[in-house]
Amino acid sequence: MRKNACCFTGHREIPPEDREPLRAALLSEIQRLYAEKGVTEFYTGGARGFDTMAAEAVLKIREALPVRLHLILPCKGQSDRWHFAEKRRYREILKQADTAEFLFERYTPDCMLRRDDTMVARSGYCVCYLRDPAAKRGGTAYTVRRAKKEGLEVIHLIPVEVEQLTTL
């Protein structure tokens, strides 16, 4: 666990009314983590939705502050089935990231969870967008539970009691 590092986890689908407030919250939280906690390393998994928003927020903040964006990607070809606009954003983020690491050559049944585990292992903080704290399934719920178990400070961009989350 690294105290100067933070990972992001959140849903792929974000309701339209949440998008702008979420972008603002991400920018604010990244700046706060840098100023108050000395966080300079930010990890995202490169998925659609929240991961993309988080990566773009780090890149925006990087224009003014010495922060770095690291992509931990589950497999090559992750974006193959995405829509054209999503693929374009993904490629742009890949080009601008400080590092990009593919964990597997091709998709495996557990590659997404291994990506999540890797980000948690490299971080001291986890910023999340989790709409249902009682969720027992899904990558976001899994990653938040894992982060809590590993002792990371979990920061919810939607107020949720971490204790409400079920154990791994």
Locations of regions flagged by a protein language model:
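Acidic/glycine-enriched connector segments
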Residues: M1-L168
